[in-house]
Amino acid sequence: MANAERIRHVASIIQAYKDKKPVVVLSAMGDTTDHLLDAADAALAGNVDISGVEKLHRDSAAELGIDFSPFEPLMQELKQLLTGISMIKELTKRTRDYLVSFGERLSVRMMAAFLSKEKTPAKFFDAWDLGIVSDSNFMAAELLDEVWKNIPMELNSYASGAAKEIPIVTGFISKDKKGDITTLGRGGSDLTATIIGSAMKADEIQTWKDVDGIMTSDPRLCSAARTVPEVTYEEAQELAMFGAQVLHPRSMVPCLKAGVPVRVKNSYNIQSPGSIIVQKHSGAVPKVCAITAVKGVTLIDITSAGMLGAAGFLAHIFNQFLKWNVSIDVIATSEVSVSLTVNTKADLSGLLEDLRRVAQVQARPGKAIVTVICDATKSADVLSTGLVALAAAKINPQMISQAASKVNISMIVDDAQRDDAVKALHAAYFE
């Protein structure tokens, strides 16, 4: 929600669903998180300034006809925090989490106030008000198992009909057992929504984006891209891992556990049914579900005759990646070689030096992973069709890998060929 206009629009969506007893999870407004981090930088330099955050929310409240006085205590709390940062000249992870939490806390108060003004009773909740507790891994906290029983207990009066106000809940933030505010890392707001929906055994969880659900490919690349009506959790996780803007993979874990479907809808096109994420396809499994791609990876080829018949060689190789904290994306192996991809942003110097002590190693940056999400039982047909299409486009995959899940085939191409590869594959499978 970038501004007052978007608050009005989101409020209209909430009002359209009020008979279904929704629980609403919100992120911070617009650029609030950036404003907060800028304010922290200024405080570290000795300047306490909340004007960026205050102006956005004060102006939005005025435009929405909301009294700003209930927001003043939070503004004072923020100012006190920044004053403390300016005095000690330090921003710890714990303090950073406390700082960025103001974005979500202000957002839910704004929405609840506006809905109530518009005769739709609503009540804001900070996540910890619903018993959403985490460990103390600041900036990337994990929720504790007790949230599964806490949430239904705290929302029981609303679920039973005794309480009428629509709950408006902060996404992304939590508290640890000591009462310190934590943030849930990437996909944190989606995770808040899915854990609430799953714990409450909701009919479905809806996540509202700016596209018509999950698309067969990036519509900015493929004008013929269309909405995929239904995907499985497994397919959606693979799509998210390889660049598609769906739910973050970790946010799908609660709904997979509870069996609650997730619908991805477009806040700019509310009439579109979007896409639904389910445990199993309700009908025939499509041969190809979607194509996605991610740029900026490095392809590493590791070759050694010592691999042939040697027990533990791969374990030694992978231990080097663990030692240097480098995550592997895609992998393919043969009797004497391993090819794999890693994020180019990772510092590879120490890793490559260690690997070269036991094998011949070639690192090739500037690569892209193009992934086809498909039906495992038709992988031969999918692969042959795809390779013919790429050959016609004069694109030669430098590595091919099929995931253990059997729902994706990944091909490595040059960064410069990524867009053409996606277009060629989309034309072959969907057009």
What are these regions (language model features)?
Residues L247-P249, A258, Y268-S275, L348:
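Surface-exposed amphipathic alpha-helical tracts and adjacent flexible/coil segments at the periphery
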Residues M29-G30, D129, V211-G213, V260-V262, ...:
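Glycine-rich beta-alpha junction loops
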Residues M1-L247, M252, I412-D414:
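Nucleotide/pyrophosphate-binding catalytic subdomain
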Residues Q271-E431:
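A conserved regulatory-domain signal marking ACT and ACT-like small-molecule sensing domains
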